[in-house]
Amino acid sequence: MLQRSRLLWLAVFITLWVSSDAQDDAKEEENTFDLLQISNINRKTIGAKLFRGPDPAIPAYRFIRFDHIPPFKPEKLKKIVKLIRQNEGFILSATLRQDRQSRGTILALEGPGISERQFEIISNGRANTLDLIYWVDGFQNVISLEDVDLADSQWKNLTVQVTGENYNLYVGCDLIDSFILEEPFYEQLKAENSRMYVAKGSIRENHFRGLLQNIHLIFDTSIEDVLRKKGCQRSQSTEVNTINESTEILHLSPAVTTEYVGEKTEKKAEFCDRSCEELGTMFTELTGLRIVVNNLADNLQKVSEENQIMWELIGPNKTLKNQSVCWQDGRVFADSESWIVDSCTKCTCQDSKIVCHQITCPPVSCADPSFIEGECCPVCSHSDDSEEGWSPWSDWTKCSVTCGSGTQMRGRSCDVTRSACTGPHIQTRMCSFKKCDHRIRQDGGWSHWSPWSSCSVTCGVGNITRIRLCNSPIPQMGGKNCVGNGRETEKCEKAPCPVNGQWGPWSPWSACTVTCGGGIRERSRLCNSPEPQYGGKPCVGDTKQHDMCNKRDCPIDGCLSNPCFPGAECNSYPDGSWSCGPCPAGFLGNGTVCEDLDECIAVSDVCFKVNQVHRCVNTNPGFHCLPCPPRYKGSQPYGVGLEVAKTEKQVCEPENPCKDKTHSCHKSAECIYLGHFSDPMYKCECRTGYAGDGRICGEDSDLDGWPNNNLVCAANATYHCVKDNCPLLPNSGQEDFDKDGKGDACDEDDDNDGVEDDKDNCPLLFNPRQFDYDKDEVGDRCDNCPYVHNPAQIDTDNNGEGDSCAVDIDGDDIFNERDNCPYVYNTDQSDTDGDGVGDQCDNCPLMHNPDQTDADNDLVGDQCDNNEDIDEDGHQNNQDNCPYIPNANQADHDKDGKGDACDPDDDNDGIPDDRDNCRLRYNPEQEDSDGDGRGDICKDDFDDDNVPDIFDVCPENNAISETDFRKFQMVPLDPKGTAQIDPNWVIRHQGKELVQTANSDPGIAVGYDEFSSVDFSGTFYVNTDRDDDYAGFVFGYQSSSRFYVLMWKQVTQTYWEDKPTRAYGYSGVSLKVVNSTTGTGEHLRNALWHTGNTPGQVRTLWHDPKNIGWKDYTAYRWHLIHRPKTGLIKVLVYEGKQVMVDSGPIYDTTFAGGRLGLFVFSQEMVYFSDLKYECRDA
């Protein structure tokens, strides 16, 4: 029985222990909130990227799309706000790695309105503070903890305590800074129609930049317990001697009461303070106790048996036979009778057995109790002294604050061996110092303007003044002064002041009334400097003055016989002689005899010339110019004499409707001047973000040149006016195989055969049965070699038969095994160097090199590649048709071996280029029927490529007529790299759109057209949310070691291969010049990834200081301007209709032109759409 009792007590003890532990766990779970979990943030959340943090079992997140961050669940938010009010605050625990010197919101509560915020916690890396911002009665309050060192790109474990009056920050186990709150802002928090977020700021600049992990809100737990759970150890002595700035009371034994003068606080939750070792010792002691109890039970049983034997020996009293009585000390006691053996033992007779027990005394509450004779228990004498047992009070502690209201404490101890010590052991009182300076840094603000002052004059024009002061508010704590002037002055007008009249200057003397013999001359003046006004006095004096003139005697006049040429001045002398002055304007001679002057010959450039032909007409006398030629505008001067001819020359300017604003382009279109020789002289192109024929433009969301809605364009419109069949995905070719109105780019089943494109082995041909004989993942119905494995489907001669199964790949009627250029059409099979490779496809046609190696990918074999290029135009000297003049395009229209750039007669028609009205077409007759300066033979097609100039992307180069990347050279920049695969390019829109589908090593798809000055534009779009790396384009490509590249990174990242050099890639647009000494390989690969300069590899010309990365599923449009002659490079990037990136003018003359191409590095599903390049060599 005793054994069962012991086991029962042990089971009760274990049950209470486990139950207490479970309650603690439930309480912790109820009062601790995982903010990422209640926000439903996981790996599927858009814009949330998974990373590995310090705790490998829990994911860390970086947010790049803050508009997709979900708020807390409403029911959880209501509970959190309720707990904040109950606990008078909260504790925030988080593990984070914040980007260096960034400013980011960690936690924010916004609402009930759309733009209202109730409070937020912001880590300000620029100011190195942790800011608590809250709003009370519409006013913003900012409290900053300083020198926190959070935004340094290092992992930090922080604990933020906002409880009562405390605002404290712990990093790890260290208290960094603290502040006393003056307002209980948490009492005004509202959950209704509100939203709480992590990482999301009120504006774009306040979003959190970095990684977050293990972010929790904790309630009903002291800051000491939170830190203890994080492994922070605090010694007992330290805890006892620490006085908290809050009004919490130290927890002592329940036997001692505490008196507190200040505000009451709720009792904090207690936790088990026994270690596992202590509990083990307790079980050992319980086992020993069980042994002792068993021994006592055995001894008691022996005593009972001995008593029974004694009872039988003595025997009962004869008179008490058949009665239940008890014997003790010779006395007989009846059944149920009780008696006191001594003062502290009481016995009772029960069924002839004596049962005794000791009297239990209640505890006394005094130090000196007294005993009354005959009584077992001591008693206290009554005393009214409440100080009994207490030590004297200690001195008051220092005030808890240095300004404002605080508290002081004092204590005393109790001698518990002498007294129960009624009353408190700690007392608290208020203390007050000078008022705290709660000022914060604030910028100055202007007061209202004062009234205008009175006018500074009583008549006429004066000034009035008003002032304002920089005192609303006054700048303080380093705040900025007010911007602007504190004084304004304006004119004021009163009645005009009287103006007295003043004489003006005398006029010249008039001609004398006679030339000799005495005459009269006069002069006059006016009272107009100024005239008398507004009651002023008139001028005093005469208005006219007379004088005698020509008083000499009259001579004999020799000019009366008109001896001089008409118009020449005749001078007569007193002796009767005469002389003639110079010939009149327009004549040459001695004054007596004059001849006509031919101004057209004397001033050869007096009139406008067309093709060096003079358009001046000489008259007698004088000259005049013919009207400006057709499509020119300007003056038609005429006159007489050299002075007029020299000063009034004819200027004829080509008509330019774009400049004159006489064009008919849409307001959202750009007028592009084509030249006065073109008909029409201009064309209209819709601006970025719009599409149409230029006369009419509509919205174009995906920037692929097709409008969102149908446009009513002109009847002869040839450009995009039809509604975009994929309005949200760039597809400039508008391919629609099944004609269902939905473009192939966004149609999940292009051929309507019931098999989605990503699973269809013939996505553009109806084949529901999906037969594939050769297992090359190309269906038999669309396989150009159905019985030969050829997944690439290359068909060089475009005859429908793939190269893998064709006996004549290039279609030149020479079988492959006998064709020395199997992939190039060459019927003559010429092979000058006899290396077995035909001249048409030989990269060294004059030097034996059967292996055809080309290490630098410049289309010149290594055997004959000397890389000597004095003019830096990408063509080595012995292959350059102008070795000393840069001409990357190598244009040579008369095929004489001398490039146009250094050929004085490009068409070899005997007319020098500067006088040839068709510089690129043979026309020795120079016929020009309309006299506009452009020869008839090249009127609308200057380069004779059968493409009208208005549609020709290079109207002065017959080798290039349209944008076309259908044929390109694939250049792997890390050909031996094993980290990823090579790029995979898909061609669309007749080479005006390319899609790169693979997550690849760095590579270029470079076209074969070559350019000097060029404009290059295209639409950039990433059709996936996977990865965040580089894409862009190249220009001035001369080899895989020499080119310019514009590359765009989504997020900042260190390259995963840190050999041979460590590479840091920053988000944003970078413009780089590659001039590698090693060529393709891992050195160039890491240098391209790195944002900065790598000696001997890459030099960064410009990086966008805003570090804006591209976004998934967003269309961008780039525009490049490159002028190698001056070194000008300029790049614009549009997002929608707005310019997002503008490099401004950058100058670099490393390379004088080259080829264009597209670039990718570790980024898949990149769309390059609506590509367009135009020559700008003119």
Swiss-Prot record:
Glycosylation sites: 157, 244, 317, 322, 463, 590, 716, 1075
Short name of one Pfam family: EGF_3
Motif Cell attachment site mapped to chain: 934-936
Region (Disordered): 737-760, 852-941
TSP type-3 repeats: 699-734, 735-770, 771-793, 794-829, 830-852, 853-890, 891-926, 927-962
Disulfide topology: 399-431, 403-436, 414-421, 455-492, 459-497, 470-482, 512-549, 516-554, 527-539, 559-570, 564-580, 583-594, 600-616, 607-625, 628-652, 658-671, 665-684, 686-697, 713-721, 726-746, 762-782, 785-805, 821-841, 844-864, 882-902, 918-938, 954-1175
Molecular-function GO term, any one: calcium ion binding
Quaternary structure and interacting proteins, as annotated: Homotrimer; disulfide-linked. Can bind to fibrinogen, fibronectin, laminin and type V collagen.
Protein name: Thrombospondin-2
